[in-house]
Amino acid sequence: FAGCKEDHLGSWFSGIENYPEGGVVRTFSRKKLEHIFDACGVGERSFYYPYPDYKFMTTVYSDAYLPGRGELSNNLRNFDRDRMLLFDEKSAFDGIVEEGLFSVFSNSYMAVIGAPLDLKYARYSNDRAESFRIRTEILRDKEGCKTVRKYPLTKEAEAHVRHMPEAYEKLKERYAGSSLDVNVCHLGEENGIPYAEFEFVPGRPLSELMDECLDR
């Protein structure tokens, strides 16, 4: 819709025009993928949404954790072919998110067949200095409890992650007695890799609040 060429053919709008020139190549909507799974007898499955798309993904959303208004602003990531800029994609995504249609208009889909995964969201912050490159995950266990974990993406970033609980203790001491609550942080380890775990705090992200201020 936004002017990127079709993935396989390199032609304009052939996917949304239902491939008028024919051929065997096809990309599918979520609804079509679900029809294929049903026809194959596939039962349990979960859908994830790589953003901006599956090629140069920075974030993965899921039905349990969908994007909010203002989050989908990093859209110019197709480096393989020329493209057209037909409209303001951030504004279009904001409208799609507000209408609850992101699962329909996501640029890419990742389907996991089988029991649901604990992982509900992941973001890769790998455009930083190597000592600060991390992955943030939101997980939900079988009881529905959510937690947030931050993993180092490089050996150099391990010190940054290990420092997070210390920063938490200093912030807690600094703001003791005030109305500001500091998110609890614990250090853990998985397969020899440290991670910082935080409680999941529901609320509205800063990006959404700032977008509202800009609108005013």
Regions found by a protein language model. Name each.
Residues 2-3, 50:
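Alpha/beta-hydrolase-fold catalytic nucleophile elbow
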Residues 3-24:
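Short, glycine-/aromatic-enriched active-site segment of Class I SAM-dependent methyltransferases
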Residues 23-49:
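Short alpha-helix
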Residues 45-83:
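Conserved catalytic loop of SAM-dependent methyltransferase domains
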Residues 77-112, 116:
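Conserved Class I S-adenosyl-L-methionine
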Residues 105-112, 131-136, 193-195:
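Short hydrophobic/aromatic beta-strand or adjacent loop that forms the aromatic wall/cage
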Residues 122-173:
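ATP-binding glycine-rich loop module of kinase domains
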Residues 182-216:
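Conserved structural core of kinase catalytic domains
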